[in-house]
Amino acid sequence: MLRCAWQNGPRQSNRWLRHLSNQIWKRSYSSKIRNIGILAHIDAGKTTTTERMLFYAGKTRALGEVHRGNTVTDYLTQERERGITICSSAVTFPWNDHRINLLDTPGHIDFTMEVEQSLFAVDGVVVVLDGTAGVEAQTVTVWSQADKHKLPRLIFVNKMDRPDADFDKCVADLKDKLETQPVCLQYPVKNEDGVLAINDVITLERLSWHQKDLGRSYKNVKLEPSDDLRQLQEKRSELIDQLSGLDDELADVVISTESFDKVDNALIERALRRATTQQKVVPVLLGSAYKNVGIQRLMDAVNSYLPAPEERNQIYDCFGTEVAGKVFKIVHDKQRGPLTLIRILRGEIKRGMRLISARGQAEVVSKLYEPLADEYREVSAVQSGDVVICAGLKSTVTDEEDDELDESDELFAIDPQIPDAVYFCSIEPPSVSSQTAMEQALKQLQREDPSLRVSYDSVTGQTVLGGMGELHMDIIKSRILSEYKIDVDLGPLQIAYKETIESPALTTLSVEKEIAGSKQSVSITLEVVKNQAEMFSLDKSPENLPNLNTLRPRILQVLRKGSISALERGPRVGGQVVETQIRLHNATIGRGTADSFVMATAAQCVQKLLSTSGTRLLEPIMALQIVAPSERISGIMADLSRRRALINDVLPKGERNKMILVNAPLAELSGYSSALRTISSGTASMTMQPCGFSSMNSVDESLAERRAQGLE
């Protein structure tokens, strides 16, 4: 039977749902739908931009402001208190006869998994830059995520009203740091009163926004002959020349035209659309969301240049008459239960429709909602290409291993790249009676956030959380209190060290036991070696090959699982063992021996090998960008040197500031934000993100072991 797929986002295994009822399938894509994500570095103005879109589209009656805590998309208590986006949220609004489904995503590195989930559902993205800062650390991260999903994108350079904004530097950053080909459709200009206006390259108009009506209206005036017009005409000619090298239709017109001035605007826009959807160029627009400038033209550009659903996802035509879509996020609502956010790829979903997952679990869609952050408007049906919230799908999301997927799953799966946890800590309920409620809360939070790791430490008997940073862990604790009314205690934050073997080792382990009257016997020879590629391999040397050829594929899979499971917890601090390969030399399995016994023996053999070879610790390293006034740099660098930091570069940042690029061990950065504020008297800013692991010297290793044992 052909399996229609509902594909989940990261760590929420790939799910494909198909319609069981006998219906005639009609392709109902609308060319008027745009599914977009909005991405940015923290504080670039992404949420403010989204709030302006909702306001000008008529979905809200007042302007939402981050600093006032009244935004639509930042609806969690923690988001409004801190002024940052934590969870991605979906909103739907009309604009110029189009329907835009927008996913607002977090900008903080601790919540990058939310970005990854959202990109499963969109056809294009808007990347917001801070006009005073250009391309920043998290901009590079989200750009690479969009690259992985092959998403067309627009650039919106925000905060161009600021005196220190530098549009040319932002464009240069796009070329140098993101290695993309930007095409500037607008340039900033200040009116006589000093207010930001925009010169449009294609239409040769000046756009000025009226602030008396909060930017709802703007006037566009053709530029009179002047230096500004001549410069803009040159920019228009450069744009046409650039696009004609990428688009045959425009090139044919240019060849037959005497002057670039006679090239029709509509022809330029069509060529720009084709080049954008084919990811040959990235259109660049500008404005100031906070000052209500440029937002309507940004929404026009979304409609004009980003693809409709029918222009992507042609691969899913193979499902024929089946209904298919992607499940990209799960949220929990106290009144409605689990809500499933779905991007519909084919067909139409209706309320009451019966669906079945590729794993054979039947579901019934009890209700459908149009998304507006945490507000929901019920609808009866949703067509292909759209985004919808489904209630009633209680078992669609489960945590299954990748190796359980069959070929059809692998064909349509996207590697989620769930980042490794960099911190972990114990979590305890306030009382024994709250244990079950806490476990249920963690289960629901894990469904929403795949980067949250929950495990049980059999040695200490504690529940252990793993997360992306101090802020991530703090938000989890706060959400458990505010949403589930459980005041949990978090233990001290511990660094998520990794381990790697010091030297190769080879051993044989033979185990015989009688369990429930059945004899269980396994003899296995394994070796551990340094290797960054495969975690498990077969030693197909002449002396071992005859034995390996007698082992059934199922037994090899069991041996592989057992061996790899032992690498999850190293002998020194319980860190994951990496850069290590297990080689199977030979194995003898007694008749009637259970798979679980074989798996346990393999794990025990690997643990013995790790103890024999010995392990070294690897500590997580963070890449920091610190911006501070020049006179504060020496004090900051002196403090960094005491933290075992490696200073890579010091660059000028504007007229008065400098930027320090540095790598430092995470273990030395606890509370560093507060320390930096003290050293710089509050004048410095910092961004930080993981950049890999590094080996440690013996003194630092001993200190790390003592910290892991709670002795420091």
From Swiss-Prot:
One of its GO terms (molecular function) is GTP binding. It comes from the Eukaryota. Residues 31-310 form the tr-type G domain. SMART domains: EFG_C. GTP binds at residues 40-47, 104-108, 158-161. Residues 1-29 form a transit peptide. GO terms for biological process: mitochondrial translation; ribosome disassembly. It is found in: Mitochondrion. The keyword Transcription does not apply. Its main location: mitochondrion. Pfam families: EF-G_D2, EFG_C, EFG_III, GTP_EFTU. Keywords: GTP-binding, Mitochondrion, Nucleotide-binding, Protein biosynthesis, Transit peptide. The keyword tRNA-binding does not apply. One of its GO terms (cellular component) is mitochondrion. Mitochondrial GTPase that mediates the disassembly of ribosomes from messenger RNA at the termination of mitochondrial protein biosynthesis. Not involved in the GTP-dependent ribosomal translocation step during translation elongation. Belongs to the TRAFAC class translation factor GTPase superfamily. Classic translation factor GTPase family. EF-G/EF-2 subfamily. NCBIfam families: small_GTP. PANTHER family: RIBOSOME-RELEASING FACTOR 2, MITOCHONDRIAL, TRANSLATION ELONGATION FACTOR G-RELATED. This is Ribosome-releasing factor 2, mitochondrial.
